[in-house]
Amino acid sequence: MAGRGSLVSWRAFHGCDSAEELPRVSPRFLRAWHPPPVSARMPTRRWAPGTQCITKCEHTRPKPGELAFRKGDVVTILEACENKSWYRVKHHTSGQEGLLAAGALREREALSADPKLSLMPWFHGKISGQEAVQQLQPPEDGLFLVRESARHPGDYVLCVSFGRDVIHYRVLHRDGHLTIDEAVFFCNLMDMVEHYSKDKGAICTKLVRPKRKHGTKSAEEELARAGWLLNLQHLTLGAQIGEGEFGAVLQGEYLGQKVAVKNIKCDVTAQAFLDETAVMTKMQHENLVRLLGVILHQGLYIVMEHVSKGNLVNFLRTRGRALVNTAQLLQFSLHVAEGMEYLESKKLVHRDLAARNILVSEDLVAKVSDFGLAKAERKGLDSSRLPVKWTAPEALKHGKFTSKSDVWSFGVLLWEVFSYGRAPYPKMSLKEVSEAVEKGYRMEPPEGCPGPVHVLMSSCWEAEPARRPPFRKLAEKLARELRSAGAPASVSGQDADGSTSPRSQEP
C-alpha cells in the first residue's frame, strides 16, 4: 500500500500517467531517506480564482471529472478543491472544465517590458566583417549572426561559421523583399533566418545556433518560458477582418477556438509591438479583449480572442435606435468605462480610445481593444496623423498623453454611442475641429441623448485635464443612470448577419 500511496502522490504533484514514468531510485537512497511531513510536500502557493496557469505535462486519459490536457496548455483557476492539491479549472481553448492536480501546473507569468528583449538577438547592427569573424569564434558549423553592411548601406550581411571559415552573404533588397540568391525572397530578416534554419538552400550550411548580441535576451525563449508562445502548427488562418497601418487582422482558429490574429511583418515594427504585447500579458479584465499568445513566424502574430459582433461603430450603425434601446447604450458605455477604469488603475494610457476600437461579443459585452498596441502605433506617427477628433487638446498640442486625455476621448466615444455610430464633429474638417476646440467649442448632445449622459460628456471635455473625472467616477455615474433607466438593456430583432440577437441583457 505504501508503494501505491507514493504513486498517487507522484501523480498528484508531477502529473505522470503511469508507473513507467516514475524516476528510478536506488535502494540505498530509499533506506537513508526520511520523507518530509505531508504539509511540507503540499504546494505552498495558493492560486486565486481567475489565475492563469500553464500545464507542465500531458494528461490524455482523465478519470471522470478530471480535465484532459497537453503540455503547455493554458487553463484558468476556477476554485480550489477541499483537497488542497487539486483545482477546478477551465481550459482556454476547449472551454471544458474539470479537476487538475496542482503539481501539474505553473502560473502563467506576465512578460516584462524589457528593452533587452529582442525578436532578433542574432542581429548585431553596425559591425565590420572582421568584428563578425571575431564574434563567431571558436568555429562551429551553423553558428551565425546578421549585421548591417558597411560597404552597401541599407543592405545586410548574413555571417555563417563553416569549417574554419566565416562566410559572408550579402542580403539584397528587391521590390520590398530580401534575398541572397535572387531565387528565394523573404519579407524580413526573421523570415530569412527561419527559412535557412530549416533548409540550407544557397548557403553553406543550415543555420544552427545564433550568436546572440551582448546584452540581449531572446524574445522567443522568454515568451516560451512565461507561457505566451503559441504553436504555429495549431493555427489556421481565415479571411481578413480588418487592416491597420502595420498589418492585416485575420480571423482564424487555434486548436478549434475562434481567434483574431494581427500579423506584423515589418521586423522593426514587430519589435515595437513586442514591447506593447508585454503590457497585454499583464492585463486581465472582462471588458478588455484577451491576449491568447504570440507566434513568431515571418514576423509577429498576435493572437487574441475573437469578438464575434465586430466593432461598436458598425454594430450601432447597422441596427440603429429602432433595435437598440437607451439602456443597452448605457450598458455598452458602462462596460467601456469599467475596462478603462482597470487600465487607469494599472497606470496604462490607451491613446486611441474610440468606438471603432471597442468590440462587441456574442453576449453583448463591450471590450476595449488595442489597449496594449496604441503606444507602438504612435511611434513613427507625427501629430498630423493622430485621430484629431478623439484626441485631447493637450495631447494634440504638446504630445502629452495621460489617463485624463483618455477621459476626453471617452467623452467623444459617448457621443458616438448615443448618436448610434455617427462620426463626431459632423461636417467639420480636422483643422476646423482643432481650432474650434482650442477656442472652447464643444459638440451639442446627439438627438435623444439623456441629460445626465450629456453632463458626463461635458465633464470629460473640461479644458483643464485635472478637472476631468477619473474613470472610476464615470463608471459609478453610468451604473447609477443605468439603474434609473428601469428597462433592461436590449437589442431587438435580427443582426445584420441574419442571426437573432439576445433580446435582453440584464444590467
Swiss-Prot record:
The organism's lineage? Answer: Eukaryota, Metazoa, Chordata, Craniata, Vertebrata
The PTM Phosphoserine maps to 501
Q: Does the keyword Transmembrane apply?
A: no
The name this protein goes by in its record: Megakaryocyte-associated tyrosine-protein kinase
Name of the gene encoding the protein in the UniProt record: MATK
Give the superkingdom in one word.
Eukaryota
Among CDD domains, the record links this protein to: PTKc_Chk, SH2_csk_like, SH3_CHK
Q: For ATP, which residues are the binding ones?
A: 241-249, 262
Keywords from the UniProt entry: ATP-binding, Cytoplasm, Kinase, Membrane, Nucleotide-binding, Phosphoprotein, SH2 domain, SH3 domain, Transferase, Tyrosine-protein kinase
Q: Does the keyword Transcription apply?
A: no
Which family, according to the similarity comment?
Belongs to the protein kinase superfamily. Tyr protein kinase family. CSK subfamily.
